[in-house]
């Protein structure tokens, strides 16, 4: 696998070299604490994701106006939006993010393989509330200084979502100053998905931070299962992006709890 993770890291390096993250605008973020939103929600807190492609599936949806998609997600009751800014393998861009940011008032996650402060500077400029760090990249020493990146992000007024896939990664992530921990049900070595990943990790490990579940969530039953396991929020991309009625799909999932 190293293979896929290495590719992701190299893609971020390539994007940095190609000046993808050189942003001339400066947009405000929502100013809303997603953690509070998740804690106070009476229904399922969804972070819905706008992504047109992925390494696992290739093309997910024809590239169209992200603002139209975002507005349907918000109307359906999404608590936050995740927008891909990584051009390689994900067909994302900071421009997509900024278009959406100008239209929505809810929290937004800059979804990318963050390896450098240049990307955090970009997150600040494009109006992100959160950016992503992947625990395994640091545990495998493919990227260094996680705490430094977290501290830098906090100084910029940003919050951090750390993604973990194994119990060890989860324990390591919980010890950091990150704001939210995401359990990725997808194994980044094999790209296989197992929702029991969230169950196994939360059965065995305490964490004082807000924990969300990510990847492979397709139905109301999935959300109810993950809720029972202890997940407080749910990051859902593909199942919504593939749906012909995005607003209704989001509404149904939000009302699953």
Q: Predicted segments — roles?
A:
Residues 115-127, 166-177, 213, 217-236:
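Catalytic cores of alpha/beta
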Residues 100, 108-138, 147-149, 153-156, ...:
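Hydrophobic, well-ordered secondary-structure scaffolds
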Residues 77-78, 103-106, 125-131, 154-158, ...:
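Glycine-enriched alpha-helix->loop->beta-strand junction motifs that scaffold or abut catalytic
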Residues 125-140, 182-191, 231-250:
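Glycine-rich phosphate-binding active-site loops on the catalytic face of alpha/beta enzymes
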Residues 180-228, 232-236:
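Catalytic-face loop-and-helix region of soluble metabolic enzyme cores
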Residues 195-204, 227, 242-257:
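C-terminal helical cap(s) of enzyme catalytic domains, especially alpha/beta-barrels
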Residues 1-108, 115-118, 157-178, 189-196, ...:
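Conserved N-terminal beta1-alpha1 strand-loop-helix module at the mouth
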Residues 72-74, 100, 123, 149, ...:
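Generic structural signal for hydrophobic
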């Amino acid at each position: 696998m190293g293979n896929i993770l290495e590719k992701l890291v190299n893609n971020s390096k390539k994007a940095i070299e190609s000046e993808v993250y050189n942003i001339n605008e400066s947009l405000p973020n929502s100013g809303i604490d997603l953690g509070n939103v998740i804690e106070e929600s009476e229904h399922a807190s969804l972070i819905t994701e706008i992504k047109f492609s992925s390494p696992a599936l290739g093309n997910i949806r024809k590239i169209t106006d992200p603002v139209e998609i975002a507005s349907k997600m918000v109307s359906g009751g999404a608590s936050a939006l995740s927008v891909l800014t990584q051009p390689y393998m994900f067909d994302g861009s900071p421009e997509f993010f900024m278009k959406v940011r100008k239209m929505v008032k809810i929290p937004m996650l800059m979804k990318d393989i963050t390896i450098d402060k240049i990307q955090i500077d970009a997150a600040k400029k494009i109006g992100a509330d959160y950016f992503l760090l992947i625990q395994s990249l640091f545990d495998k020493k493919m990227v260094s200084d996680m705490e430094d990146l977290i501290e830098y992000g906090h100084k910029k007024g940003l919050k951090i979502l750390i993604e973990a896939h194994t119990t060890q990664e989860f324990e390591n992530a919980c010890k950091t100053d990150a704001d939210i921990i995401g359990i990725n049900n997808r194994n980044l070595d094999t790209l296989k998905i197992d929702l029991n990943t969230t169950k196994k990790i939360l059965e065995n490990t305490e964490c004082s931070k807000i924990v969300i579940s990510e990847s492979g969530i397709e139905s109301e039953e999935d959300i109810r299962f993950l809720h029972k396991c202890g997940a407080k929020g749910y990051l859902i991309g593909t199942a919504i992006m593939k749906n012909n009625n995005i607003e209704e799909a989001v509404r149904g999932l939000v009302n699953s709890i």
